[in-house]
Amino acid sequence: MATITLKDVHKTYHGDIAAIRGVSLAIADGEFIVLVGPSGCGKSTLLRMIAGLESITSGEISIGDRVVNGLEPSERDIAMVFQNYALYPHMTVRQNLSYGLKNRNTPKEEIERRIAKAAKSLEIEPFLDRKPRQLSGGQRQRVAMGRAIVREPAAFLFDEPLSNLDAKLRVQMRVEIKRLQRALGTTSVYVTHDQLEAMTLADRLVVLNGGRIEQVGTPIELYENPATAFVATFIGSPSMNLLDLNTGNAAWSAPAALVGKPGLATIGIRPEDITLAGDTDGGERFRARVRVGAVELVGAESYVHGTLANGEPLVFRVAGRSRMMIDEEVEVAAVAGSLHWFDAAGRRL
């Protein structure tokens, strides 16, 4: 196990295309960090730089007490789990697990001990003599994780390992990965574009945008106190509603105390914090009339997609099956404590 430290790391392609812009990050020993952001934000590039698969243009990366800028991947004491499993198709599961250890001249007894331990923890003991083509997608991903575990590395690096699995398997494997990481206590860096996956796995989230860090914090910190409008809309599903004060607030009303902050340009409200007006307790409130455009039933709740009088979209949640009709007008409200405020640059006020 080890700490991982990045100091002012940059990555530039062809001299002027900046993929990573001055990233600094300290990852504690045993911590599970998730790098999350939209496509092209630099999360996979950053992971590959930690792994040594991608060179850095400037800055410093340390694993434990060693600066690893000039070290090969095999010298960094890390193990990586890829999106495409990267299993040898002509080898059995047992051979896939042992291959890297044999190349490092690990004693046979130690190889068998590590394989037995990993196979038991991952529940792949019945499959040790099968080849990858005889396994399901979830079983292959477990084998890929097992190959990383038997290395007993200082850190695990995960590059979107669940993206090839169906929704049910993704949930199962999320739980499995978190359980294993806690049991092993190994420092882990995980890349995903799926904010739900990020929220459920991470000790801390690192939200990237355009090669820069937007915010670092626990999932609940980022959800409840997003530092920027970008983080506010990226973390949470459906996204936070952002209402632009520059378009005029004739479509909604709120006490002056809620909208009179100096520099205020945008108000944010999460869909789950909006209720039908009659369901909201008293006190200072945001209120608006919404024309219903669509209703999504997602089981125990529904999401209503509508528009305000000025054309701005608004999404809100209602319990159970909504009886609202398309083009119906309803009044909604939100209490003062649920509002978020951002300036013209998208920074939290």
UniProtKB/Swiss-Prot annotation:
It is found in: Cell inner membrane. It holds the Pfam family TOBE_2. Keywords: ATP-binding, Cell inner membrane, Cell membrane, Membrane, Nucleotide-binding, Plasmid, Sugar transport, Translocase, Transport. One of its GO terms (molecular function) is ATP binding. The complex is composed of two ATP-binding proteins (UgpC), two transmembrane proteins (UgpA and UgpE) and a solute-binding protein (UgpB). Part of the ABC transporter complex UgpBAEC involved in sn-glycerol-3-phosphate (G3P) import. Responsible for energy coupling to the transport system. This is sn-glycerol-3-phosphate import ATP-binding protein UgpC.
